[in-house]
Structure formats: C-alpha cells, structure tokens
C-alpha cells in the first residue's frame, strides 16, 4: 500500500499541473454552512466546497462527495482524488450527457488520523476518523476485504450541511483515504480514494446506489466460483432466466436491445453468469461496468441510469403561473433543463391541436387569434434521448412533464416592466466541448419573448425555433479553439464561451518487441512471444483531466488506469492474463476476468486501438497498432 505521505506528494504534483476540473475546488472561499452551529466537532470542522454548480440545489441532482481519513495536511490528496473520480465519471454515459443535471459538492472534514479501519487486513489498526469507514464490511471477519463501509448517520449529517439538498435529491459518495481496492453501493456509495481502479469503483457503486443495478459478478468471495443460481426470475433489469427466444416472444427484460452492438463490447444477447452465480442466470453483455471495472454501462444499464438520474430532477424547471386563468394578450413560457447530449422537445397544444412552434420555449398568444371563451393551452416537455427505448420510461415523470393553462380572452394581463436579461446558462468558466448543447435562458416579460442571438467567432449562427439551446454538433466545427457568444438584441447582455474543438491526443509506449513490422497501408505491427507492457499518455491544450481508453479487436472501450497495483505503472498484456487478488487482468485477445475463465492464449495478430476523452467531453479519434503474439521457441 502506498503511504499517505507518498499520496500527498503525488496529489501536490497533480494539483500544480493544472489537472483540476474546476477552479472552485482549489479556491472555494468561505465554507457553506448552516445558520445553526453544529454540535458535533466533525460537523463544526467540515467545509462544503462547490465543485460544479449547474443550478439551484433544490432543482438539481446533487452529488455530495466526502472524504474520510484525510488529515488537514492531506486535503490536497482528497481534492486530487475527487478530481480524478469526476474526470472518469463524466467520461461515462449517461453521466457525460446528463452532467448538466448535476451539482457536485465536496465536503472536506479533517481527520484526526490518516487512513481508515482494517486497511488492508483485519489486524490493521483502527483509525480515529469522522465517518468510521472500514474495509472488511467494517472490520467483520465474516465479510470480504473489498466491502468498504461508512457510518451512514454521520455521512447523512455531513451531507445535510449542503443547503438545498435532501435525501430525495442527492447521492452521497464517501471516499476513503486508501490505495486498497474497495467500495460499496448500499444507500450511499463508497470507494477508496487512491487505488488505481478507484475512480472506476465510483460509477459502479453509483450504479448500485442510484440505479438499483445489481452485480454481474459470477463470484462473491474472490477466487471462489459462485456455483449455480437457484432463485426465481430476478427482479433485476439486467439479469434473467429466460432464453433469448423467450425474451423476444414475451417482450421481456432487454428485448428492445437484443442484437445491438453493446456499448460495453460484443453484442447484446444472453451471457451466462451474474448475481454472484457462475451458471443458471444470464446478463445482456459479456462484460460491462457492473461485471468488470473499466468498461462502460451497456445499453440496458444505461437506460436504467438515465431514468434514475432524470427522476432526481424536473425537466420542467419553471413556467408561466397557471393557478388561475390567464389572458390571451401575453406570452406563455416554460423553462426546461438542458442535457449536454441533446436538447429537450417541447410540444405546445391549444385545445388539443398541435401548434407549430419549432420547439420554442415561448408562445405568443396574440398571434393565435383566439376565439371568445376559455381555451386550454398545454406544453409537454419530453427527453427524446436515444438512450431510452421503453415507452413506459419515456412517458414517466422522469422523462416527460406536462403543464397546462386556461386562457380567456376576456382577461387583461397587467403590464410587466421586467427587463430582458440572461438568467441561467451553461457555465462560462470552463471550455465547452464541440459536441455539447450550450444554453442561455432569459427573463420572461409578459408581452415579449427576448430573442437570443448566437455568434461563433464573430459570425451569426442561425438557430430558429428553440433559440435557448445551441447544439454545437450541427456546426461541424473545425479543430481548434473557438469563441461562442450569446446576446439579447437591444441590451448589453452578452455571454461568452470558449469552445474546445480539438480533442486531447494520446501516445503509447510499449516494452521492447521481438521485432517491428512496417507495411504500407497498415498500422505498425509489434511481435511478442510473451508478456509486454503498454503505457498510454495524453496531452491537451486545455486544462482538466483527460481519460485514456483502449480496446482490443473492436471489443468494448476500456479505461486505462495504469496497473491495478500501481497507477503509475504501464498496463501489462500477457497470453493468459495476470492474476492479482484472484482477478485476471490483461489477457490479450478474448478477455478473462476470473481464474476459471478460459486461459488459452490467443496466438495471432490483434488490433489495439486507443483514444482520449477530455474534460470538455471531446472524444478523440481512435488510433491503432497491431500486436502479433507468437508461441515461444522451445
């Protein structure tokens, strides 16, 4: 295990090289605190730091990250760990597309002692820490080492210091100051802060805590195959006893996704193992983040997570008051959320008839020439994301909201002197990615709808209909850095963003091969007769964390983390894989996760691709090289 002092030195290096996602974490200013002075010393010493603010806490999903076992001198290590975990989280769908729904808060609470309980073994010292985190299920000999627990009451008390949050709109993630592999996903998610794999533990555990996803492991105790599943049809959305024909015929479980290339690699179908059983139960994909850390959520899990995230917020953030009838001499408006992955749809209907509004957020009733009497106007906000295929999910309150008004021509609307101005908008403090949706909301005078005019590098950008959202994907930006502005005509109001349209680049370094082969029109080929290492480095012209990924033979993209025992070491490929703590890493060819998976070497030529995902969400183009594995002589 790396010493806390070593981790502190590494954290200082990471902080001083400009890797933090947001400046707010470094220079937060005064702590956010409740008016009443907390009686608990830990609460009194806690400091709440806004890391990412996308809107009012009571209208957002709030991720509250707190550390345990970090002394005051190790605050830099906690901040660096938070940065690393968030960088990976934002690279994974659906968090990448719905990042704008989420506020992130860091709760810094100094620990009297460094580290957590029973780390790494049951005979390790018990530490005096604010959250009483511990491995082995809280130092339980009947548990497993990787089960990292937290005192839920103490965690909830710390989260309560974040104003505007409640158990209904927040997710707690507790990071332990440790390099030992571990985490848990009960009511709250836990993860070790500094393990090479720890930033991948966090989304896995949030999958449990927030999405209700289940483990796809085919073991419970490491190194021991789980045996046959003996239960009934699982309630889990991503486990089943049904055959593939039965899934189709009954339109059950993941039938809508069958046959699709899996985002986690391979094809969505029926793959045996899960729920800690080796046989007798099946999952959608050969591997996903709920089975093997490093891969993505597959489509089935991703759909569950979209609903879970969206259920924590209201797509319809605000609207023209509707508690009483309104006049026909005014405008009617709605304010919506703004996913980074694509704008929401707003459908307007008058007395059941669809109005042609071009997805606008405002309707001018004066232009409708309403007849005398009362009319009903409705606005339905829907998330059209392709991540969801189940109509029941699409039609749920998580992804569809409707508001209605009674409109009466006999009523006169009082004058409104509200000035046109910007209200909420995409943060301007960090670059936005070339495939993001940028938004700018405005005030709502009763007899006008302030227009938003967009310019890219000084040139007007047409954006009819919904002028509050601008989807940068439609602009096909040239590589480089651009300036985007939004203005309200007739006012001095202007917003300005830097658009990062140049992805980070990656480079690889391999251990010495037997030989190197260069052929015209083919990637460079390296020949090995045994294990070899691959280091991936990234460079970016913008600040922020860069995630590096690779994949073998077109399988799922896998997040590069160094090596399980050392984040600074290169990844190691070998013919049969390397067993570490009863898990298998780095088998070249068909991957292997546990010792009982097929260890037969895949001799021949393999394609290794690599790419980057930068802090703005830009996904770099994949580059590749070839590796040919030959049998050793003799």
Task: Give names to the regions the model predicted.
Residues 320-336, 340, 386-456, 474-634:
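Low-complexity, disordered linker/stalk regions enriched in Pro/Thr/Ser/Gly
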Residues 2-35:
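Secretory targeting and sorting signals
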Residues 37-158, 193, 387:
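Propeptide-to-catalytic entry region of secreted or membrane-anchored zinc metalloproteases
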Residues 115-118, 154-192:
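Catalytic zinc-binding patch centered on the HExxH motif and its immediate surroundings
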Residues 352-365, 458-472, 563:
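Surface-exposed, flexible coil segments in extracellular/virion-facing regions
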Residues 77-78, 182-203:
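Short pre-active-site segment immediately N-terminal to the catalytic Zn-binding motif
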Residues 200-216:
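Active-site recognition of the HExxH zinc-binding catalytic motif
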């Amino acid at each position: 295990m790396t010493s806390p002092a070593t981790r502190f030195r590494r954290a200082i290096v990471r902080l001083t090289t400009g890797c933090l996602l947001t400046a707010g974490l470094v220079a937060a200013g005064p702590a956010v605190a409740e008016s009443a002075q907390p009686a608990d010393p830990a609460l009194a010493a806690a400091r709440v730091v806004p890391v990412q603010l996308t809107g009012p806490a009571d209208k957002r999903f709030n991720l509250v990250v707190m550390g345990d076992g970090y002394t005051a001198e190790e605050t830099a290590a906690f901040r660096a760990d938070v940065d690393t975990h968030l960088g990976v989280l934002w690279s994974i769908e659906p968090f990448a597309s719905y990042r704008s729904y989420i506020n992130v808060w860091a709760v810094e609470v100094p620990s009297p002692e460094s580290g957590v309980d029973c780390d790494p073994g049951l005979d390790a010292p018990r530490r005096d820490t604010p959250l009483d985190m511990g491995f082995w299920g809280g130092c339980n000999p009947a548990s497993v080492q990787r089960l990292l627990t937290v005192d839920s009451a103490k965690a909830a008390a710390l989260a309560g210091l974040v104003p505007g949050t409640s158990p209904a709109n927040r997710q707690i993630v507790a990071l332990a100051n440790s390099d030992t592999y571990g985490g848990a996903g009960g009511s709250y998610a836990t993860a070790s802060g500094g393990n090479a794999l720890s930033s991948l533990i966090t989304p896995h555990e949030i999958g449990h805590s927030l999405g209700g996803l289940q483990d796809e492991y085919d073991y419970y105790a490491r190194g021991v195959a789980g045996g046959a599943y003996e239960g009934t049809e699982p309630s889990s959305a991503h486990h089943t006893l049904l055959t593939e024909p039965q899934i189709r015929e009954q339109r059950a479980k993941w039938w809508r996704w069958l046959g699709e290339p899996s985002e986690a690699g391979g094809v969505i179908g029926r793959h045996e193992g899960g729920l800690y059983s080796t046989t007798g139960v099946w999952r959608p994909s050969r591997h996903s983040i709920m089975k093997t850390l490093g891969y993505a959520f597959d489509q089935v899990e991703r759909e569950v997570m979209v609903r879970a995230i969206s259920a924590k917020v209201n797509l319809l953030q605000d609207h023209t008051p509707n508690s009483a009838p309104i006049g026909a001499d005014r405008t009617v408006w709605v304010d919506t959320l703004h996913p980074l992955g694509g704008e929401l749809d707003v459908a307007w209907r008058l007395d059941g008839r669809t109005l042609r509004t071009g997805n606008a957020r405002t309707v001018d009733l004066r232009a409708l020439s309403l007849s005398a009497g009362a009319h009903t106007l409705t606005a339905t906000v829907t998330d059209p994301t392709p991540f969801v295929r189940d109509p029941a999910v699409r039609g749920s309150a998580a992804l569809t909201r409707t508001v209605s008004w009674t409109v009466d021509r006999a009523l006169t609307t009082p004058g409104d002197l509200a000035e046109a101005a910007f209200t909420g908008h995409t943060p301007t403090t960090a670059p936005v990615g070339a495939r993001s949706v940028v938004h700018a909301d405005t005030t709502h005078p009763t007899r006008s709808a302030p227009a938003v005019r967009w310019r890219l590098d000084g040139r007007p950008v047409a954006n009819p209909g919904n002028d509050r959202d601008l989807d940068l994907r439609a602009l096909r930006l040239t590589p480089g850095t651009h300036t985007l502005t939004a203005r309200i005509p007739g006012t001095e109001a202007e917003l300005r963003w830097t658009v990062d349209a140049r992805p980070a680049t990656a480079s690889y370094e391999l251990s010495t091969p037997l030989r190197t082969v260069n052929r015209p029109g083919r990637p460079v080929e390296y020949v090995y007769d045994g294990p070899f290492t691959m280091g991936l480095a990234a460079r970016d012209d913008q600040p922020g964390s860069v995630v590096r990924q690779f994949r073998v033979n077109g399988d799922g993209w896998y997040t590069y983390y160094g090596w399980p025992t050392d984040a600074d070491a290169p990844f190691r490929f070998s013919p049969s894989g390397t067993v570490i703590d009863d898990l298998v890493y780095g088998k070249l060819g068909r991957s292997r996760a546990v010792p009982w998976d097929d260890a037969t070497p895949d001799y021949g030529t393999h394609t290794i691709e690599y790419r980057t995902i930068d802090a703005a969400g830009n996904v770099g183009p994949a580059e590749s090289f070839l590796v040919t594995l030959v049998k050793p002589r003799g």
